Each structure stands twice: as structure tokens, then as C-alpha cells.
């Protein structure tokens, strides 16, 4: 479309604007509709399921188009944003009555998934984050912005692995990366990844724009002055936010420097397996958050989600939260606070919309109600003696002047938008009241005029009325129109009627319509001025909102502690993880029978538990509940256990369950091995590691060998490890690894049917119960019977060269009777395996040796 002269004036105007936003859908305001043209129309018609048509011609071709009513915009925007689309809103800013040629239009806002602020487009209980990334293979700068709250963070991260784990944690809906990065990098595979010009990330420009935004000389006060990569990313984010919002951003007041060392790190697999806030099916039911979130406000739910996804290693913060929960439980004080907190609502996002100058009348009404509830809440907070709660109370103000202003200004139940007025109270502004009175008295004038004209003309069917297109009129039936007086001027002909206007009615119309339009303009001006007044108080209001959100989360955790029977964990310096009567917080809520609680003990004498037992016996539940108890402790929450004593952990790893990564071309076994490799490379003696059925995705010998070697390596790393397996050969590990112990989930058989007891007991399992589980799953009886025959034969098979793998220590429970898989290996492989010095082998040498062993089979 380089030659615009061939187009009509309207399309020339359209293309000048469209060329500035080639990759976004443009909604072009024409009267009461937003019209969409050309390729945008084809795409929008398909996505929105609306009719695609054509509008005249331009440059010799018909124009594909579709449209939506202007008052239905929000619903269509919501659908497009959920589909990941961005939309440019182009409004008429000129006056059609005075315009020569097309009415002047401008882009007034750009809607993207990461920069939306409209309540209708947002999930109220989820952060809506946009991130920007700058760096190379070794070091990355990451900036994250929530435009709906003003939260703005930066950090620098070493390596792709840590970066991808962090991106999984924050889960941004948009991710901005430099356009000069190579194609196909891991970050670009995330949904919402968008390339931006390299100069958008310029570090010097970024530093200047950030200092200007925060009105500071430098960034030292934010602790990020030397994070040049993160500053470049933050500058890109700030520029993108200003570009889309087309206004100042006064609610963005500071940068917060986050450090991965301050947090318990969970990789993508661990977050998925633990189902913190999203279950394995992609929903929210039966997640940890679904059980522990009874927050009164949406802003508190979002904060709790952030806590769950960013557990802390800061003992000072964790103990302050624990003390706060104890205080709120004392005398059930949380019960008094929660109804008052509910009155506060989501003022965090309301304040952001005020800062963006797009707050709606109902936002201000909700803020008015929230400010009105603050004095009573402040009185209740004054009774809380816990130091952290006292700090929150000190931050939370009452703002009587603002509360009074909003009470005087906004009617009790305002309309959704300011567009048609009717928002401000009578008495708030005398000039507005006068204009409205002039407009509203029109009704009585028309009644009086109709009565006078009927008397003057003798025409009983005469009516006086008004419509938005033709204004005021006097209507007569067609048969009586010829009897109209001479001062009646014909205005409109209808089927069966004629409409007229008189000089008197015309004079009144000019006065009334002028008063109405002037009243609307006055009300909009006053509304904008009200927003500016609130913007002047934005900083303390935002601080209060943050404090109230945290108070809500802590009150919620106190309520959950009482009603879910949670107890306060103790953090100790001694390396340990001891749990008495631990429970799975989610599973126990969905069971119809009592949950079987279990103990766990890991310390300097025992760092790994080999867990055996039948399928469905509870091994995975036992492991997951341990991880969730540790995680809940690291957000400052009480935990589902009678007693819990632990030291700080640095990471939580899970290798539980796998599926094919078809898009990535990886098999189930490859996914499993990738997760295992990540654990073996990154686990430390402060890590919690859950390993479930490692090695099951390949041949028996390969799988057992890999599981054995992985377990030995984790024992040597001294990581807190729960290692569930069906390879009973691994139960001899305690004989060679002093930090390893056996436990099992017990079960019993009755009348050839299995009964799961779910108790964790010392020692290895006595048998696998695999056939009983298969029978429970509905495997045909004839197959079960045949399997029993095969099992009996296999269990009695004895080969001449069978030898024990390791001698049994005195007092050690008998290893369960099961065919020894290693016993059938040819002698050369056994001999080679016995000569290996595993401590001196590199990972590469270990893999090569495994291949050599396999070739000897």
C-alpha cells in the first residue's frame, strides 16, 4: 500500500495509521461502530465469529470489512486478548460538523495481553505480567511488570536453566526479546514472546527513562544500579507500557531487585508435579492454592499466589509471618478482621486504573466504600501486638478527606461509564446543577407546549416529542397535517404522520441541547479533575493497599491453620527435616475416609529414604505431601503436621511422572532422563529431591542400572531424598550407603484382594502386590490367572551363577523374595561392574561404561 493517492481520503487516513501498527488488529471508529478492514477484517471475523462483508471500493478494489457496535467493545476485546491478540483502538477526535473531509482520528490506546487494565479483561485472582529479557547464553537481565498493580521487578540470572525456571514461575503473558537475537532460542518458544527493536533495550536510554520515571538521579536506591542487563530490559518494558497506554504512568513508583538466592527454587517440572496453583489438567481445582486460599480480596489472592510460587529463604521474614499468624489466631482475632477486609475490595487494581486515568465511575464508588471502611479496620488492627502486624497497621492510613470527597462526588450506584453522564451527585458542582436543571426541565416545558398547541390549533391528536436524530418536534397525523398553522415548519415525513418545528420550539431546542451537551462536558471535566486529585495521593494509597493485601493473606493463613488443623513449623540450624503425622493438604480434603498421617525423618544420619510398596499404596502422596509441607513452611504458613522441624532448603526437585514431549521431539524416557540430569547437576546438601520410578521408561537392566547410579549419586550429594521405586534390588543400598534407609507403604491381601493401609513403616516392602492392583483395575480374571502362573515360574527360577549383590548386615530386615535381576547377567559384566570406582568417574565416563556393560549382555 505504498501509493496512498489511489485510495479514497478515508482509506488514506486509515492506511497512514495502520502502517504504524502493522502487526496488530486496528479497530477504526466510524460513528457508532468500530470498523475493521482488509486482512485485519478477515482475521477478526474468524476469531470473533462475526460476518465478513465488503465496503465499497478503494484503489479499484473492494474493501473486506467487519464491524462491532462501540458499546460492545469490551466483550470482543476480552475474547481477542485471551487468544493472545493485540488491538489498536483508533477513535474520532474531530467534530464531524466542522470537519472538511474525513473526521480526524487518532490511536488512543493499544490493548495487548500484558498491558490490559480493564477489569472485564482481567482474571481478578491472577497477576497479569509482562516481561522483557536481555543477555547472552551466560547471563540474562530479566524485568517484570504488572501494569495493573505497579509492581516492577528486575533481576539478573545465570544460565538458560535458571532463566527458564524463573520464566515458568512468573509465567508472563508477554515476553519481549531483542530482534537481533538468533531464531529458535528457548525463551522464544514461550507463548506471548514478541521481538522488539534492539534499540528499545539500549541501556543508557533505559537508565535515563527509569530515573525520569522515578524522579531520581540514579538507580542506586533500588539496589540495581550495576545490573546493566536488567536495566536495559526494564527500559524496554517501561517504553512498551507508555507506548500502549498513551499516558503517564504515575503508579509505577519504584523498582524492586529480586535475587534467586533469596528463594527456594523450583524448576518447571517441580511446579507442574506439585500442582501449586494449576493442576496437571490445566485447571485450578484440587491444587494447593484451592485449599489454602480463602482470602477476602482478590489482591490478597494474587499475593498468596506470588508467595506460593516464590517461597523464601529469609528466616526473618518467615518468622515474622509465623508470629503474625499466631497473633491472629490468639482469641480468633482473624474472625473480626475478615469481614472488614472484604469491604476493602481490589483497591490495588482500582488505584492502577486511576493512575492510568481510565478508572470508571464504579471504580471510584468502590474506592469510596473501601476508604469508608478503613477507620473501623484501623481500630481492629491497633489491637494486634505482633511487630509485623503493627508495621502493616502503621502503613495503612484512613484518608478522611479523600473519603469525604468521593462521598460528596459520586452517586451511590453510578453507571458503568462516564460517557453519558449521571455520575456526580447533585450539590457537588453548582454550575453542573444549573445546566442539568435546564436540561431536565425540558419535560415539563414540552408538556406545557403540547397543551398550548392543542388549544391553539384545535388538533386533539397533536403530540410533542424528541429523538436523538431529529431533535424536538410537533407531530400530526397525515390527515391533519394540512391544518397545521403557518408558523409550523415541516421537519420530517413519516408513514401516517408529519413532524414540524416552530420558532418557539427551535429556540427551546437550541437552549436545551446546548445545556445538555455543556452539562456532559462539565461533568467529564469534573470527573477528570477528580482523578487528578486522587493521583496526587496515589503513593500512600498504594502503600496502604499493599499492607492490606498482606494482612488479608496472613488472616487467611490463620483461618486455614485453625480449620485445617495446621501447626507452626520450627526452623532450626541443624540440617534436618523431621515431620510427625504429616498429611497431604489437598488429598485429605477430597477423601471421604480419614487421611492416614505419616512421619518422616531426615538428618545427618539419614539423608535418603528408599520407598517401596504397591502401586496405589501412597508412595507418591507421601513424597508430594513432604514437598508441600516444606514449601508451605517456606512461605511462612503453618503446615499439615502435628510437628515439623526443618532447616532451610535451597531447591525442591521432583521427578514424578512423565509424558511425551511431542512438540519437542522427546520421548517419555528422554523427558525423564532430562529431569534426572537437571537434579543430579544442581542438587545440593540443602535440596529436597523427590524421585519416583526412575528408569522405568527403558529396558529392565538399563532402568535398574540408571536408578541405582542416580540413587548413589544423590546419597553422595547428601540431598534430602525420597526415592520411590519398584526395583527391589535397590533396597540393599543401605548396606553400602550409610545415609540411606528403607521404608515401605504397607498393604495386605484378603481373599486375593488388596487392602491399602497407607502406613509408612521401616524396612523394604514384603511383596509388590502388582497382580492385586491389576485385578483392582479391572484386568480380566483369565489374564490375572495366567499372570499368577508366570509369576510362580519366575519366582522359582534359579540360575547356577546367582550371587547376592551385597552381604546383608546383622539386624537388617530380609530383602523381599523376588527374582534377582542382576543374577542373570553374564559374568563379564558382573566382574566389570565390580571393578568400577564410581567416585572417580565423570558423568561422560559413566554413560560410556553403561554402553560397554550393555554390549556385554
Swiss-Prot record:
Protein known as: DNA mismatch repair protein MutS
Keywords, alphabetical: ATP-binding, DNA damage, DNA repair, DNA-binding, Nucleotide-binding
Cited InterPro entries: DNA_mismatch_repair_MutS, DNA_mismatch_repair_MutS-lik_N, DNA_mismatch_repair_MutS/MSH, DNA_mismatch_repair_MutS_C, DNA_mismatch_repair_MutS_clamp, DNA_mismatch_repair_MutS_core, DNA_mismatch_repair_MutS_N, DNA_mismatch_repair_MutS_sf
GO cellular component labels: cytosol
Annotated ATP binding sites: 613-620
Region annotation (Disordered) ranges: 794-816
Superkingdom: Bacteria
Family in the record: Belongs to the DNA mismatch repair MutS family.
Gene3D superfamilies for this protein: 1.10.1420.10, 6.10.140.430, DNA repair protein MutS, domain I, MutS, connector domain, P-loop containing nucleotide triphosphate hydrolases
Organism, as annotated: Pseudomonas entomophila (strain L48)
Pfam family for this entry, one: MutS_III
Biological role: This protein is involved in the repair of mismatches in DNA. It is possible that it carries out the mismatch recognition step. This protein has a weak ATPase activity.
SMART domains per UniProt: MUTSac (SM00534), MUTSd (SM00533)
GO biological process: mismatch repair
Single GO MF annotation: damaged DNA binding
Lineage of the organism: Bacteria, Pseudomonadati, Pseudomonadota, Gammaproteobacteria, Pseudomonadales
Amino acid at each position: 500500500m505504498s501509493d496512498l493517492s489511489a485510495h479514497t481520503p478515508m482509506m488514506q487516513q486509515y492506511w497512514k495509521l495502520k502502517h504504524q501498527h502493522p502487526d496488530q488488529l486496528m479497530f477504526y471508529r466510524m460513528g457508532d461502530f468500530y470498523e475493521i478492514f482488509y486482512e485485519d477484517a478477515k482475521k477478526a471475523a474468524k476469531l470473533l465469529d462475526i460476518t465478513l462483508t465488503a465496503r465499497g471500493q478503494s484503489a479499484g478494489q473492494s474493501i473486506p470489512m467487519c464491524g462491532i457496535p462501540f458499546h460492545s467493545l469490551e466483550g470482543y476485546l476480552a475474547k481477542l486478548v485471551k487468544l493472545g491478540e493485540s488491538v489498536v483502538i483508533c477513535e474520532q477526535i474531530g467534530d464531524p460538523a466542522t470537519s472538511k473531509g474525513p473526521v480526524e482520528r487518532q490511536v488512543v490506546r493499544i490493548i495487548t495481553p500484558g498491558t490490559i487494565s480493564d477489569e472485564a479483561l482481567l482474571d481478578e485472582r491472577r497477576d497479569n505480567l509482562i516481561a522483557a529479557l536481555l543477555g547472552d547464553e551466560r547471563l540474562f537481565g530479566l524485568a517484570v511488570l504488572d501494569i495493573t498493580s505497579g509492581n516492577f521487578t528486575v533481576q539478573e540470572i545465570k544460565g538458560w536453566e535458571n532463566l527458564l525456571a524463573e520464566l515458568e514461575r512468573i509465567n508472563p503473558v508477554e515476553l519481549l526479546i531483542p530482534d537481533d537475537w538468533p531464531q529458535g532460542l528457548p525463551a522464544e518458544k514461550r507463548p506471548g514472546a514478541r521481538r522488539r527493536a534492539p534499540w528499545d533495550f539500549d541501556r543508557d536510554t533505559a537508565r535515563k527513562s527509569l530515573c525520569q520515571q522515578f524522579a531520581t538521579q540514579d538507580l542506586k536506591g533500588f539496589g540495581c544500579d550495576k545490573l546493566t542487563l536488567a536495566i536495559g530490559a526494564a527500559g524496554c518494558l517501561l517504553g512498551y507500557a507508555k507506548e500502549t497506554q498513551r499516558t503517564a504512568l504515575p503508579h509505577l513508583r519504584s523498582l524492586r531487585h529480586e535475587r534467586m538466592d533469596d528463594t527456594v527454587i523450583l524448576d518447571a517440572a517441580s511446579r507442574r508435579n506439585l500442582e501449586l496453583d494449576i493442576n496437571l489438567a490445566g485447571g485450578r481445582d484440587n491444587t494447593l492454592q484451592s485449599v489454602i486460599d480463602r482470602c477476602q480480596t482478590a489482591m490478597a489472592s494474587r499475593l498468596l499466589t506470588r508467595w506460593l510460587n516464590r517461597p523464601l529463604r529469609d528466616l526473618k521474614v518467615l518468622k515474622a509471618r509465623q508470629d503474625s499468624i499466631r497473633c491472629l489466631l490468639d482469641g480468633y482475632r482473624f474472625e473480626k478482621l475478615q469481614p472488614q477486609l472484604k469491604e476493602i475490595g481490589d483497591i490495588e487494581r482500582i488505584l492502577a486504573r486511576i493512575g492510568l486515568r481510565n478508572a470508571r465511575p464504579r471504580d471510584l464508588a468502590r474506592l469510596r466504600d473501601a476508604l469508608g471502611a478503613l477507620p473501623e479496620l484501623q481500630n481492629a488492627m491497633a489491637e494486634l501486638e505482633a511487630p509485623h502486624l503493627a508495621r502493616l497497621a502503621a502503613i495503612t492510613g484512613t484518608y478522611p478527606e479523600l473519603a469525604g470527597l468521593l462521598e460528596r462526588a459520586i452517586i451511590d450506584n453510578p453507571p458503568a461509564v462516564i460517557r453519558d453522564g449521571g455520575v456526580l451527585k447533585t450539590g457537588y458542582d453548582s454550575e453542573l446543577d444549573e445546566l442539568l436543571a435546564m436540561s431536565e426541565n425540558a419535560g415539563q416545558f414540552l408538556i406545557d407546549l403540547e397543551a398550548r398547541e392543542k388549544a391553539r390549533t384545535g388538533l386533539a391528536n397533536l403530540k410533542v416529542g424528541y429523538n436523538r436524530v431529529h431533535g424536538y418536534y410537533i407531530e400530526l397525523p397525515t390527515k391533519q397535517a394540512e391544518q397545521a398553522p403557518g408558523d409550523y415548519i415541516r421537519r420530517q415525513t413519516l408513514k401516517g404522520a408529519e413532524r414540524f418545528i416552530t420558532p418557539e420550539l427551535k429556540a427551546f431546542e437550541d437552549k436545551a441541547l446546548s445545556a445538555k451537551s455543556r452539562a456532559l462536558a462539565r461533568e467529564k471535566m469534573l470527573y477528570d479533575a477528580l482523578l487528578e486529585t486522587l493521583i496526587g495521593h496515589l503513593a500512600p494509597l498504594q502503600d496502604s493497599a499493599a499492607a492490606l493485601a498482606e494482612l488479608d493473606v496472613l488472616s487467611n493463613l490463620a483461618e486455614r491453620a485453625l480449620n485445617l488443623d495446621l501447626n507452626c513449623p520450627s526452623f532450626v540450624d541443624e540440617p534436618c527435616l523431621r515431620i510427625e503425622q504429616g498429611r497431604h493438604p489437598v488429598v485429605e480434603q477430597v477423601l471421604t475416609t480419614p487421611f492416614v498421617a505419616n512421619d518422616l525423618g531426615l538428618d545427618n544420619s539419614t539423608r535418603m529414604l528408599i520407598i517401596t510398596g504397591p502401586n496405589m499404596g501412597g508412595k507418591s502422596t507421601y513424597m508430594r505431601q513432604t514437598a508441600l509441607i516444606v514449601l508451605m513452611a517456606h512461605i511462612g504458613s503453618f503446615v499439615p503436621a502435628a510437628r515439623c522441624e526443618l532447616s532451610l532448603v535451597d531447591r525442591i526437585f521432583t521427578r514424578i511422572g512423565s509424558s511425551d514431549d511431542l512438540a519437542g521431539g522427546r520421548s517419555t524416557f528422554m523427558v525423564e532422563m532430562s529431569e534426572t540430569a537437571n537434579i543430579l547437576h544442581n542438587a545440593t546438601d540443602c535440596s529436597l529431591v523427590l524421585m519416583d520410578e526412575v528408569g522405568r521408561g527403558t529396558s529392565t537392566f538399563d532402568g535398574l542400572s540408571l536408578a541405582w547410579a542416580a540413587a548413589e549419586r544423590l546419597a553422595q550429594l547428601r540431598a534430602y531424598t525420597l526415592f520411590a521405586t519398584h526395583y527391589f534390588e535397590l533396597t540393599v543400598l543401605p548396606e553400602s550407603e550409610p545415609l540411606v534407609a528403607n521404608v515401605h507403604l504397607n498393604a495386605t491381601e484378603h481373599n486375593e484382594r488388596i487392602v491399602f493401609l497407607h502406613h509408612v513403616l521401616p524396612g523394604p516392602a514384603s511383596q509388590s502386590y502388582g497382580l492385586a492392583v491389576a485385578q483392582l483395575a479391572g484386568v480380566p480374571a483369565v489374564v490375572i490367572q495366567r499372570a499368577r502362573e508366570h509369576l510362580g515360574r519366575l519366582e522359582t527360577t534359579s540360575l547356577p551363577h546367582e550371587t547376592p549383590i551385597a552381604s546383608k548386615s546383622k539386624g537388617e530386615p530380609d530383602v523381599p523374595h523376588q527374582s534377582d535381576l542382576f543374577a542373570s547377567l553374564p559374568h563379564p559384566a558382573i566382574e566389570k561392574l565390580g571393578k568400577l570406582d564410581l567416585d572417580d568417574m565423570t558423568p561422560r565416563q559413566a554413560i560410556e561404561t553403561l554402553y560397554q556393560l550393555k554390549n556385554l549382555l
